[in-house]
From Swiss-Prot:
GO terms for biological process: biosynthetic process; sporulation resulting in formation of a cellular spore. It is an enzyme of class 2 (transferase). CDD domains: GT4_PimA-like. This is Spore coat protein SA. Gene3D superfamilies: Glycogen Phosphorylase B.
């Protein structure tokens, strides 16, 4: 098959500037290209050639202005068998006109079928135009089918994934080495490390973890809570909320570390140095990719019962779900429980890693997408 993968207009692929969708496409495209001819369309970037072939994948970079129109022209010219559009349902009918003989697949990574994103008529036309809608979580699928019942027979969850080769759990030789190196660099030897990775914004709930900290310190005076991220990744300018977090952190300054934007290649070592991973998200999140990263690193996970996040947690096996997600004491209780038992942390962490290896490696994601493509072709 001749397959087109269409990124959004936000960031380029390969993912030289980050982005969940861009990371996703860069990971799965070479694996799909082992069986099919694959072209990835995304916006231009000064660090990327306009057209190049890497790992068997054709990359075409188009002007950000009028990007959708430029993609349509490419589809019309190249005659693809299957077109996979990422996260832009409103584009599908227009692109379909340029490639009427192609099968269209839509992947939905956020609440793109919400009332403020797409009209009823546009949504129905999009659903009629695609053979299948793949979503990153059951939660996102439900946001579509609850409003558009006609999508039920077409909607399927295909979870995202993680590069298993870059994450080394602490019980491996490489993981032990990375753990010691990172702890040494940050001066954290002998600490029990609780890790938060994400944007420092109220909807992500880092303030709740800081409010939970006194109860944790009481039981574990050797705890260190590490926050990785800024207001937005790559933006280290302080806003009022981040200043508030720093004020809260200063009250327990010997137990809190803020690490602003780090290079993606350094992220795995920061997971490996940690003992417990916590996602305190307060909004209905599609399914934060930090969960896959924590599993790959072999960490026990504590996550809030919001959006798709609980879908990858088996209660008591690879982590715990906080149902009273606004309550700092609930987080403190679960964190204390895990910090009190290295045996439990290791048991849950090993289950996490096995889950990642079985279900959330990029090879599995690519296989799941291929089954969708081949079924609909």
């Amino acid at each position: 098959m001749k397959i087109a993968l269409i990124a959004t207009e936000k960031l380029p692929v390969p993912s030289v500037r980050g982005g969940a969708i861009q990371i996703y496409l860069e990971a799965v495209a070479p694996l799909i290209a082992k069986k099919h001819e694959v072209t990835v369309f995304s916006i231009k970037d000064p660090n990327l050639a306009d057209r190049e072939k890497v790992d068997g994948v054709h990359y075409v970079h188009l002007d950000e202005d009028r990007y959708e129109e430029a993609v349509g022209a490419e589809l019309k010219k190249s005659r693809f068998d299957l077109v996979h559009v990422c996260n832009r349902p409103s584009w599908v009918p227009k692109l379909k006109k340029q490639a009427p003989d192609a099968v269209f697949i839509l992947s939905v990574h956020n609440e793109m079928f919400a009332y403020d994103k797409i009209s009823q008529a546009e949504g129905e036309i999009c659903i009629d135009s695609v053979a299948q809608i793949v979503t990153v979580s059951d939660y996102i699928g439900q946001t579509i089918t609850s409003r558009f019942p006609s999508a039920r027979s077409k909607t399927k969850t295909v979870y995202s994934g993680v590069d298993l080769k870059t994450y080394h759990p602490r019980w491996t030789n490489e993981g032990q080495r990375a753990r010691e190196e990172m702890r040494s660099e940050l001066g954290l030897h002998g600490k029990k490390i609780v890790l938060f990775v994400g944007r420092l914004s109220k909807v992500k709930g880092p303030h709740i973890l800081l409010q939970a900290l006194p109860d944790i310190i009481e039981e574990h005076p050797d705890v260190m809570m590490v926050f990785i991220g800024s207001k937005w990744f790559g933006d280290n300018e302080l806003n009022n909320y981040v200043k508030h977090l720093h004020t809260l952190g200063a009250m327990q300054k010997d137990h809190v570390t803020f690490i602003q934007f780090v290079k993606p290649k350094d992220i795995p070592r920061l997971y490996t140095m940690s003992d417990v991973f916590v996602c305190s998200s307060q909004w209905q999140e599609p399914l934060a990719r930090v969960h896959y990263e924590a599993m790959a690193a072999g960490l026990p996970i504590i996550t809030s019962n919001r959006g798709g996040n609980p879908e990858v947690i088996e209660e008591g096996k690879n982590g715990y779900i906080i149902h009273d997600f606004e309550n700092p004491k609930q987080y403190a209780e679960r964190i204390n429980d895990l910090l009190s038992s290295s045996e439990k942390r290791e048991r849950l962490g090993k289950y996490s890693r096995r889950e990642a290896e079985s279900n959330f490696g990029w090879q599995r994601v690519a296989e799941n997408l291929l089954s969708v493509y081949e079924k609909n072709r």
